[in-house]
C-alpha cells in the first residue's frame, strides 16, 4: 500500500509514476473523495459534540422542571443526522480504501519502460550454453528414459494436469537440490532457516499483496476454516512481521524457507502444458529479507547474488534481466528475473524473481521497526526472491547435463547429497 500522506500531498506525481506501469489514477476524483472525507469527519464530530451537549441539557432542564420534549426531539434529530453522516463517511472511506489497496507499487525510476516481458532489459549473463553432438532431449523425454523418474501420467491419474510424480534417483536429485540450496543460504549467506504453515489466512495474503486482486490465482480451501494454500513462502514468512515493531538491533532479518507452492495458473491456459515448467504444485526455496529503509537497494543486489550463487555452483548458464514496468509485479518497485538456459527450448526461462517492495507490503501488514533516531515506529522494507525454484532447477540440470544415451551426470555440488550416485 502506498503512503497516503504522499498521495494527498502529491497525487499528480503519484499518478505519473503509476501511469508508467499502465495504472490510471483519476486525480480529480481522488481529490474530491479525500476532501469529502475531511468534510464528513468534521461534520460527524460537530454533530456528536452537539448531540452530547443537548443530551446533557435534557437532564438539566428536567431538574428545573421544564418541558424536555422539545429537547428530546432535537437530540433525536441530531442522532438521525449523525447516523446519516457516519454512513456517508463510511462509504467514502470504503471507496478510498478500495482505491488504496488496488494501487500497485510505484516503479523505481531505473525500471525500464515497456508493456510486457518482451521489453525486459538484460543486465548480465553467466556461463556458456552447452553444445551437444546430438539432438538434446527435453526433460520429459529424459524423465521417461531414467526409469520413469518423471511420471506425468501417474500424476494425471492421481490428480490431473500440471502435476508430476518423481521416482528413484530423480526424486533424490530433487531432494538434494533443496538441501544444497538451504545449506548454502544458511551457512554462507546468513539466512535463518524457517519452517512455516502451507496454509494461510486472508490477512496474510492481503499483507503481501495477493488479495484482493489476485484471488483467481490462489487455491482456496472449501472448508470451515477460511484458509488458502500458499502460492509462495513469501506469504507466511513476510507476514511473520505483521503487526510487529522490530527493534533496530534485530535488523536485517533474513529467512530461508523451503515449501511446496500452489498456484491455479488461471491466466496460463495453453501455456507450458508439457512437463514441469508450469505446475499447480511445485517446490521452492524462498529468501526473504526485512531491512532498514536505507539498506533495501543494496539488499536487493545482495539477494539476487545469493540466488545466482546456486546456479554458478551448479554450473548452469543463466542471465539476469530487469523487468520492465509492464511486467513488474503488483507489489514490487523493482525486480530482477534470473533465467536459466534450457537446451531443449533453446532459450532462457525464469528460475527466480528477486524484488524490492520498499515499504509497500509493510504498510499493508503494519510491519514496523523502531527508528533509534526518532524513537518512533516506522514501516520497514521487505524483499524476497527464489533461491531457487526447485523443479525448474531440476529441469535445467536434466537438460544441461544430459548425455547421448539419455543418462544424466550429477553436478559436483550435489554429489555429497546423492549417496555416491554420480550419474542417473
Curated annotation (Swiss-Prot):
Its main location: cytoplasm. Keywords: Aminoacyl-tRNA synthetase, ATP-binding, Cytoplasm, Ligase, Nucleotide-binding, Protein biosynthesis. Catalyzes the attachment of serine to tRNA(Ser). Is also able to aminoacylate tRNA(Sec) with serine, to form the misacylated tRNA L-seryl-tRNA(Sec), which will be further converted into selenocysteinyl-tRNA(Sec). It catalyses: tRNA(Ser) + L-serine + ATP = L-seryl-tRNA(Ser) + AMP + diphosphate + H(+); tRNA(Sec) + L-serine + ATP = L-seryl-tRNA(Sec) + AMP + diphosphate + H(+). ATP binds at residues 263-265, 350-353. It holds the Pfam family Seryl_tRNA_N. Its EC number is 6.1.1.11. One of its GO terms (molecular function) is serine-tRNA ligase activity. This is Serine--tRNA ligase. It comes from Alkalilimnicola ehrlichii (strain ATCC BAA-1101 / DSM 17681 / MLHE-1). Consists of two distinct domains, a catalytic core and a N-terminal extension that is involved in tRNA binding. Pathway: Aminoacyl-tRNA biosynthesis; selenocysteinyl-tRNA(Sec) biosynthesis; L-seryl-tRNA(Sec) from L-serine and tRNA(Sec): step 1/1. Belongs to the class-II aminoacyl-tRNA synthetase family. Type-1 seryl-tRNA synthetase subfamily. It is an enzyme of class 6 (ligase). Homodimer. The tRNA molecule binds across the dimer. PANTHER family: SERINE--TRNA LIGASE, SERYL-TRNA SYNTHETASE. One of its GO terms (biological process) is seryl-tRNA aminoacylation. SUPFAM superfamilies: Class II aaRS and biotin synthetases, tRNA-binding arm.
